[in-house]
Amino acid sequence: MQDRYLAGRTAWVTGGASGMGRATALRLARAGANVAVGSLVESQRAVALEDQNVHTPPDKALAETRAEIAAHGVGALALPLDVCSDTSVDTFYRSAVAEFGHVDILVNAAGSSARKLIIDHPDALWHRMIDVNLNGPYRTIKRCFPGMIERRYGRIVNIASTAANVGYVRHSAYCAAKAGLLGLTRCVALEGAAHNVSCNAVNPGWVATDSNFSACEQEIAIAGLDISVEEYRRRVAEDLPQKRFLDPDEVAALIAFLCRDEAFGITAEAITIAMGSHW
């Protein structure tokens, strides 16, 4: 028998049509939560910049994810969402509230990366990385936080990265944005502590997602390697302590645990899940 410890709760998951976001949405649904997923999709691809690694699942992924959520006997909502747009975030939040009445759980899984040296980093690309990875969570938190405080319940989990703790060549904007997300996480946690609202960050290492595999393609091109993506992934995995990539569901399991009542004392934390690797 499944543990429906989130029955009656409503979760909003950004980046929820693929990767870690989708895995998290399904985990929360299995735990009994109604789930609203938002995601940038292929028809919105025009918003991406040159050299930006952004995975945009096909538009049908929203309907497919919605159906998989609903199969767990909970309410499901799936709509396009651009976390860089105030209008898009506002529209999605209003739709979720109209459907479910409130948002109890927020998981910020939407993200994007770019590979550029600082000396030739386009300003527009820098600002986009900050906007997606830091301002995006700020926008969604700002919408949900007042209601959580008013109802005296909330769980916020931001998917950051091991990049928040280390520096990496050609990843200055991504590392800066994810480090900033840790700062935002801690401040939200302190402001919510007296109101039964927790806020944590999860720092994954290498995860087997389409976005990560797209990043591998970029690394191959930058290094001028004549190898397949599969071979590059094999070499990366070989350098990791557990010799493998994480499954998205492993990250989702951690996030779902942080949404338990028993986990309320865990707040303002940045929890690394990287198989013993620093990156």
Can you annotate each of these PLM segments?
Residues 1-2, 166, 244, 255-256, ...:
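Short C-terminal tail/terminal secondary-structure segment
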Residues 161:
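Residue(s) in the substrate-gating loop at a strand-loop-helix junction
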